[in-house]
């Protein structure tokens, strides 16, 4: 598609709504500045969107969000290289939710993780979705991830939507041949 429209709670997207939509990238290590500590990485958006917060309030908020994603707040002075892939993904999620967005856009959120971490991250995202009423936009080739987290699915081919609907309906009875092939090859 050459154009489209994005609405958040009925409001057309504009730069002032950027806080309401945060990203979690496929490769969190590549998205982190290796010279920044966990405190600096996770609080970066707070410094932009809530500049009135003092250092103590910012540190407390970072500690709170780290605990929400299953990390201890005693890691604030550590650097990204000191963490496993799953821990880095938790840090990326913490960085995204610290400003309390309404929407998280997740690009292949588990593709770089081993199976154990994949399950933990999926469970964490489902919990955060329930606790905070988050809407998740998941970009993934892994149909198991889509089935685990999504309510609705859009299947794209060459940048065009070829099928959309409720996840269970599309997975149970796909209309497009391309979707049928995807599901067949994925074994779902």
What positions do the PLM features span?
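ABC ATPase NBD coupling module
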Residues: 5-22, 36, 40, 48, ...
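Conserved ABC ATPase signature
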Residues: 79-83, 87
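C-terminal boundary and immediately downstream tail of ABC-type ATPase nucleotide-binding domains
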Residues: 171-188
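Conserved catalytic motifs of ABC-family nucleotide-binding domains
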Residues: 100
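Conserved ABC ATPase "signature" region
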Residues: 56-74, 183-184
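A short, surface-exposed alpha-helical micro-motif characterized by mixed small hydrophobic
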Residues: 146-148
């Amino acid at each position: 598609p050459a154009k489209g429209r994005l609405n958040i709670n009925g409001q057309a997207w504009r730069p002032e709504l950027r806080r309401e939509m945060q990203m979690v990238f496929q490769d969190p290590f590549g998205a982190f500045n290796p010279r920044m500590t966990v405190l600096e990485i996770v609080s970066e958006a707070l410094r932009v969107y809530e500049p009135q917060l003092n250092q103590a309030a910012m540190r407390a908020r970072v500690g709170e969000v780290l605990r929400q994603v299953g990390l201890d707040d005693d890691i604030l002075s550590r650097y990204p290289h000191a963490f496993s892939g799953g821990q880095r993904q938790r840090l990326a999620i913490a960085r995204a939710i610290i400003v309390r967005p309404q929407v998280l856009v997740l690009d292949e959120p588990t593709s770089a993780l081993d199976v154990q971490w994949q399950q933990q991250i999926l469970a964490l995202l489902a919990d955060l979705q329930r606790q905070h009423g988050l809407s998740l936009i998941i970009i993934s080739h892994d149909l198991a991830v889509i089935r685990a987290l999504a309510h609705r699915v859009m299947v794209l081919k060459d940048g065009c939507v070829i099928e959309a609907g409720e996840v269970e309906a599309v997975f149970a009875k796909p209309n497009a041949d391309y979707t049928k092939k995807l599901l067949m090859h994925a074994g779902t």
